[in-house]
Amino acid sequence: MNEKRALVTIPTGERHRNLLQQAAPGWEFRFRGTDTLVCAPQEALPGQPVTQEDVDWAQVILGNVPAAMLHGSPALEWLQTNSAGVEAYIQPGVLAGDTLLTNATGAYGLAIAEHMLGMLLELFKKLELYRDAQKSGAWQSQGAVKAVYGSTVLVLGMGDIGGEFAARCKALGAKVIGVRRSPRPCPEYADEVHLLE
C-alpha cells in the first residue's frame, strides 16, 4: 500500500483513530478540528484547529475544511466530506481537476428524518405551547391539534432524507406524496411520486 498523508477533521476518539491507522498502515495521519464525540465523549481529545499548513500537507482529507483553504492544491488527491452537500467544493479553483471528491450521502437520513418527524409532531400537537403551560401550571386549551394519521404529507426530495421521512409518515398513517428530480418506481412508503419539472 502506498504511503499517504491524511488529514482527518471528522470528530474521532482513540478507538476510531486506531482503526484508521490499522486500516492504512504506513499512512501518516493528522487529527484536527473539533474533537467532541456524542457517542463516546470520554474518548474525545482536545481538538486542534485545522491550519493552512495541515491542508497543504494533506494528500487525503477525511472531513470538511473551509473551501478557501484548498485553493486547487495539486497535492490533494481525495477529499471525503462528512456531509452530503459539496457545493462549496465544486466551485472553480477549489479543487484541482483530478482530485477525487466523495461525500457522506446516506449517512444522515435516519437521524434527520427522526428530527423532522419530531418537529412535525411538535407543530401538529402544539407541544411547545403545552410544555410552557405545564411549567406555569396553566392547563388550558391551546387550540385544535392535528394528527399525522389521515393527513397528507408532501415530501420534496425523495432521496435518503426525504425517503426516510416519508417512510415514517406513512407508518403513522399519512398519505405521502413525493416529488423527485429523476424517474424511479414509486416506493412502498409513498402513495404517489411526481417528477419535478
Predicted feature residues:
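N-terminal glycine-/charge-rich "phosphate-binding" loop or analogous flexible N-terminal tail
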Residues: 1-58
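Phosphate-coordination loops involved in phosphoryl transfer and adenosine-cofactor binding
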Residues: 3, 98, 149-152
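Short, polar loop motifs at secondary-structure junctions
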Residues: 11-14, 63-68, 85-86, 178-185
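Generic structural signal for small/hydrophobic residues in well-ordered secondary structure
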Residues: 20, 61, 79, 116, ...
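Conserved beta-strand segments of alpha/beta enzyme cores
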Residues: 28-30, 77, 100, 175, ...
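Short acidic low-complexity segments
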Residues: 47-54, 67-70, 186-197
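Phosphate/diphosphate ligand-binding glycine-rich loop within oxidoreductases
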Residues: 56-134, 142-146
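Rossmann-like dinucleotide/phosphate-binding beta-alpha-beta segment
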Residues: 144-197
